[in-house]
């Protein structure tokens, strides 16, 4: 019997970037199609959709290439409805390595946003299509960078917070603190979403969805940290399955090694 997954794969390979396979999940394909249709103009919609996809790839490459500089390799990058995911084969263990790996993605997004702003203000750009694409790229990458710095898992900000806290305590306790901070933010975000729904504002359901994701992934990350600590106390090798960015992927099997 042929498995349906083999007949209808969840994602397709679109290219290789710096030797890293890049896949496109079908959930994002649907979003990009709706994105194109929503703009009314096929040319503008397609341009903005491509700018979005390329910006996410650049963001994830920031994680992947920084990790590579520390000797940690990336299996692939997958773009999905919830954003990008760089699947690291092994995770950085030192706090400063995790900090730089996590912060690299938002840093790339801010650099792209800054370059788009400089192009708009200091280059002789007059064509309407070029101006709109640059303007959209500027704001899109700025929002992408800020969103990923939110202090909770699975966003980069959660890992940045944990890496800083790890300097003063154990990794497990730092993960717990990051989870609590993230859940506090998730509660505020959920309340904001409920208020938007009641008052007829925008992004209400999206805010609640993000809050739920932060709540769930924070606990999952903490459980992983506890299992890792338990395994190391017995002198066993540790492997885990994770999914939140910047780590994870399709099979989500990751080796965590000690340098």
At which residue positions do the language-model features occur?
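Hydrophobic transmembrane alpha-helices and their immediate loop junctions
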Residues: 1-259
């Amino acid at each position: 019997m042929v498995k349906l997954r083999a007949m209808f794969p969840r994602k397709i390979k679109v290219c290789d970037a710096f030797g890293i396979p890049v896949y496109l999940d079908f959930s994002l394909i649907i979003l990009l199609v709706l994105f194109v249709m929503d703009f009314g103009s096929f040319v503008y919609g397609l341009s903005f959709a491509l700018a979005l996809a390329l910006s996410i790839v650049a963001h994830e490459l920031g994680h992947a290439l920084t990790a590579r500089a520390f000797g940690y390799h990336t299996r692939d990058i997958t773009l999905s409805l919830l954003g990008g995911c760089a699947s690291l084969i092994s995770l950085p263990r030192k706090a400063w390595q995790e900090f730089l790996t996590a912060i690299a993605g938002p840093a790339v997004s801010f650099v792209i946003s800054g370059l788009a702003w400089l192009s708009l203000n200091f280059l002789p750009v007059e064509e309407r299509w070029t101006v709109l694409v640059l303007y959209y790229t500027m704001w899109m990458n700025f929002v992408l960078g800020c969103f990923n710095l939110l202090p909770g898992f699975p966003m980069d900000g959660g890992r940045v917070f944990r890496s800083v806290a790890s300097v003063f305590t154990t990794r497990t306790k730092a993960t717990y603190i990051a989870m609590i901070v993230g859940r506090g933010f998730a509660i505020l975000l959920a309340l904001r979403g409920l208020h938007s729904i009641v008052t007829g504002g925008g992004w209400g359901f999206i805010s609640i969805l993000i809050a739920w994701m932060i709540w769930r992934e924070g606990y999952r990350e903490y459980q992983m940290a506890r299992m890792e600590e338990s395994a190391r106390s017995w002198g066993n090798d540790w492997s885990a399955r994770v999914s939140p960015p910047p780590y994870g992927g399709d099979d989500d099997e990751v080796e965590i090694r000690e340098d």
